[in-house]
């Protein structure tokens, strides 16, 4: 009994020393502010995922002070103003800091999650690190947020022709989406991530676009009601990216962070697939093969236009082109080679 008591005392002593050592180590590390956009707040998946990231970052040489924002524009403004050393944003917001990785969200450029996984793996490779840095900024991780689908208040809006003249909620800073709206002849209604769902749900717009993870928290089912639906067509691959002021972090922090993000890709994908699966089947609207082919070509033309206008980075478009053609080498775009 005495021996057990001695062992317990020794164990507790060792445990307290470990915690003390950990505490001292954390105190010695530089504290860096990390601003995270999560529309749901502290209970949202982006912020919750960053709690594990924060623990991992201690080994990379930084103690992170996490701040969550439910308004992405405010998070972006604070980062630009220097109030944040790093920030987590949606891919569309990344363009001022890295046009190369912002082009991941190019419309129709990634066919499925396997291509997305391969891309994130390629970009997490140390050989790709030079593309992750532009000026003072470094992309420190890319995580999937899911395929972007079109939500409609009436299933009769199941074609480009049917969408002509309809009011489409359009993220006002998303140049690609604005061009798509013009292509289909819809009426653009400017919105933000904070306002697109309320406008869709109250009938102010006829269509909106979002990944499946938006369905439940944004209550998109209210806007669809009994007549609405979701077109099963991958408009783009939404993603989240972490941006650092690289001079505020240790030299290898960004690389280790990118590797961490890729390692956790399956976990993020599981959350996305679950969200898609949990949407009632009655809402999904399948397009004919002819429509699918027609709309993919329309998006390809939009990509080429945006590349020529300097919005999309041709280097990223070339990588995405190669991923698509490896998966489907007989496709006519692989012969035409307009993005290769």
Question: What are these language model-derived features?
Answer:
Residues 217-232, 242-244:
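A beta-strand-loop signature enriched in Asp, Gly, Thr, and Trp
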Residues 90-184, 234-339:
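Contiguous mixed-secondary-structure segments that line small-molecule binding/active-site clefts
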Residues 28-148, 213, 222, 230-236:
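Short, glycine-/small- and polar/acidic-enriched structural segments
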Residues 22-26:
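Sec/Tat signal peptide C-region and signal peptidase I cleavage site
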Residues 28-60, 138-202, 206:
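Bilobed "Venus flytrap"/periplasmic-binding protein-like clamshell domains
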């Amino acid at each position: 009994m005495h021996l057990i008591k001695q062992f317990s005392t020794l164990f507790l002593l060792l445990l307290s020393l470990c915690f003390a050592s950990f505490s001292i180590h954390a105190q010695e590390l530089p504290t860096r502010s990390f601003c995270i956009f999560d529309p749901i707040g502290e209970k949202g998946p982006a912020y919750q995922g960053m709690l594990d990231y924060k623990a991992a970052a201690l080994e990379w040489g930084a103690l992170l002070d996490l701040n969550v924002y439910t308004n992405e524009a405010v998070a972006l403004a604070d980062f630009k103003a220097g109030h944040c050393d790093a920030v987590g944003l949606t891919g569309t917001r990344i363009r001022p800091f890295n046009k190369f990785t912002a082009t991941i969200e190019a419309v129709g450029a990634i066919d499925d999650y396997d291509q997305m996984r391969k891309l994130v793996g390629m970009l997490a490779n140390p050989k790709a690190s030079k593309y992750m840095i532009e000026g003072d900024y470094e992309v420190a991780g890319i995580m999937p947020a899911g395929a972007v689908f079109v939500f409609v208040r009436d299933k009769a809006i199941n074609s480009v022709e049917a969408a002509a003249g309809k009011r489409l909620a359009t993220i006002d800073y998303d140049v690609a989406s604005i061009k798509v709206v013009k292509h289909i002849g819809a009426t653009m209604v400017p919105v933000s991530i904070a306002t697109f769902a309320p406008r869709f749900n109250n009938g102010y717009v006829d269509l909106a676009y979002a990944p499946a993870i938006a369905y439940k928290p944004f209550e998109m089912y209210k806007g669809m009601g009994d007549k609405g639906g979701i077109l099963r067509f991958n408009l783009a691959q939404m993603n989240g990216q972490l941006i650092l002021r690289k001079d505020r972090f240790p030299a290898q922090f960004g690389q280790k962070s990118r590797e961490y993000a890729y390692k956790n890709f399956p976990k993020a994908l599981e959350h996305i697939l679950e969200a898609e699966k949990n949407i009632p089947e009655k809402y999904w609207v399948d397009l004919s093969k002819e429509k699918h082919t027609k709309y993919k070509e329309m998006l390809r033309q939009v990509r080429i236009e945006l590349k020529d206008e300097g919005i999309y980075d041709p280097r990223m478009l070339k990588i995405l082109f190669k991923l698509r053609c490896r998966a489907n080498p007989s496709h006519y775009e692989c012969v035409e080679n307009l993005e290769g």
